[in-house]
Structures are given as C-alpha cells and as structure tokens.
Amino acid sequence: MLGWALTFFILAIIAALLGFGGIAGAAASIAKILFFVFLALLVITFVARALRGRSIT
C-alpha cells in the first residue's frame, strides 16, 4: 500500500510541474488542433465512402 502511495505522490509532483510550468497550456493547444484535424478527416472519409456507395459502418 505504501508503494502505491509513493507512486501516486510522484505522479502528482510530475503533473504539478507540467501544469505550473506552462507545458500543459501548449499541450492543450496542440490537442485542440489535432482534434479538429482528425474530425475533418473523419468527415472526409464518411463522405468519400458514401459517394462510392459503400456502407459507412
């Protein structure tokens, strides 16, 4: 049980360093961009499959 507590304590320290260091803001911006890129690719794929007459699912 002490091992788990130590593991989560170390994870909390790493998360705090990343969060307070400004890295989290940059990572969130990149994640937002990637979300919209992959959303656009999903829509393009569905449209292309629908135009070819194939089933979407």
Curated annotation (Swiss-Prot):
Membrane topology, from the record: Multi-pass membrane protein
Location(s) in or outside the cell: Cell membrane
UniProt keywords, alphabetically: Cell membrane, Membrane, Transmembrane, Transmembrane helix
Membrane-spanning intervals of the chain: 4-24, 27-47
A Gene Ontology cellular-component term: plasma membrane
Main location: membrane
UniProt-listed Pfam families: DUF1328 (PF07043)
Family assignment from sequence similarity: Belongs to the UPF0391 family.
Name of protein: UPF0391 membrane protein HNE_2348
Taxonomic lineage of the native organism: Bacteria, Pseudomonadati, Pseudomonadota, Alphaproteobacteria, Hyphomonadales
